[in-house]
Amino acid sequence: LQDVVTEYKLRLALESWEKSLEICEPETVVVQLSAPHRGHPLIFNAMAVYRNTTARLMVDLKSVQEALRYHDPYEVAAAMTNARDKVKRSPEMLKVIQACFDCVEVAAVHGIRWVARTSATNWSIEHPLCGLDLMVILTLWLWRVEHDDEAPNAEEIAMYEKLRSLFDDDSVEMYGKLSSMVARVWGSMIDEVVVWGITKLMGESFKLHAQALSGYEEAMLAQEQAHSAPTMTSHNLAVAAY
């Protein structure tokens, strides 16, 4: 937000709302055993909006939201990947990443396939919509931690490992890096939700986004190998001349 006063008021309102949850009197409501939440479903849905609002105050993903209007997964995926520079590494960003962790943890703990097939009965449309921003931010933050020249600090390493612990080692090794794996797993989960039409678009977009992240990594590796090739050739010539 360009208006500092408005941003401050929004942050204050969000903080007050979060604190109020602790003193809310629980309503008498029957919660299904299969539900991914323990309290009232309205609180569960409101938390998705809360996390999304917190993230939007830090990262502007308007380009991704605009791309959704055209229902072209390639355009949406390109907007996702091109938003890399908007996701910074900072102590404030770690708070947003914690919100992203809380979002993906629900799916990881209950099972990706289970959530994909039952979310329509337990979740509202707010969850896939709000999860879009959070997962874009999360995958780009993970990518930066994995590829930035600046080494991650202790807090970033702890967060990275906490996220990695949500998935088995075989899955991470299969997709190479955690950033592309999270994008692919989230895309596969959302793609199976058939109740809302927009989730199909989101799922395909995240899968393409995962390919872009892993493809960029392969391009960087090829570039490094190309730079090292002349050095090796010169070394071999020098040895031969000797």
Predicted segment positions?
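Intrinsically disordered, low-complexity regulatory regions with latent secondary structure
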Residues: 171-242
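Long, amphipathic alpha-helical regulatory blocks in the mid-to-C-terminal portion
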Residues: 1-181
